[in-house]
Every structure is written in C-alpha cells, then in structure tokens.
Amino acid sequence: MTERDLKRRTREGFERMFDSGDLEYVDEAVAVGAIDHQEPEGTDMGAHLKQIIATLRTAFPDLHFELHEMLCEGDIVACRSTMTGTHQGPLNIGPMGGLPISGARVEVAHMHFFRYDDDGRVTDLWHVWNTLALARQIGAPAPDLRVSAPA
C-alpha cells in the first residue's frame, strides 16, 4: 500500500470505529493476532479495541477524533489527534470508573503509531493519551504525585 493509502486507511479507521461506533469494522481493519503494545501480552487486540470503543462511546456519545498530523514511514503511520466529547455516561476505565457523570466537554491529546500489513490491516499499535487531563476534566481528584525520600 502507498503512503497515501495508509493515511486514508488510518483516517477511515478513526471515522468508522471511534466517531461512528462501527464495531464490525474492527474485524476488517485489525489483523488476526495484532498486538497492542500498551496491553498485556496475549491480549486480543480486536476484542479489546471493541471494548474500548464501546466504553468511550457510552461515556461520550458525541465522541470525535480530530486528526492533526499523520506521518508515514514504510508500513507505519504516526498520528497526533485530539479526542473530544461530552461526558454523558459512565466511564469505566481505571481510576475513573465510578465517577459521577459530569456533563463536561473534554479535549484529550492522543498519539498513535499503527503498523499495517500488505492488506491494509493493523498488525501493531503503540499509543499514548493524556488520561490525567481527561480525569481532571471530568472531575476526578488529582492523584498524589509526591515522592517521599528516606529520612
């Protein structure tokens, strides 16, 4: 696939999966055995991605990813984006689970790196997102980040 094809495939993935909630598209877009490098070894990336999309779309029914830049080198696309949405449902992710629905509008920075196979399916994913910013925007208490030194 060309650089243009891979960028188009990346944009289509965000639009169909996250913005529209098309969970069936995950099976088309993610290769069997794909690896999400932020999850424990052996995690079924497709199943996990469906769970994350459903969780985010429940919490933020107007979920949208704005893609700012995409860079492609070989079979890898790097993408900087901002996730936006209005907190209107439960968000059961880590320490944010159980927080009351805030109604807050959120903007959260994300970085994704996707590796594609020759058929245009994701085989590897590396990603980071600013969960602290999300937690603060929906009213979660700030974590205690103090470091104590031995006396």
Where are the regions that the model predicts?
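C-terminal and inter-domain tail/linker signature
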Residues: 1-151
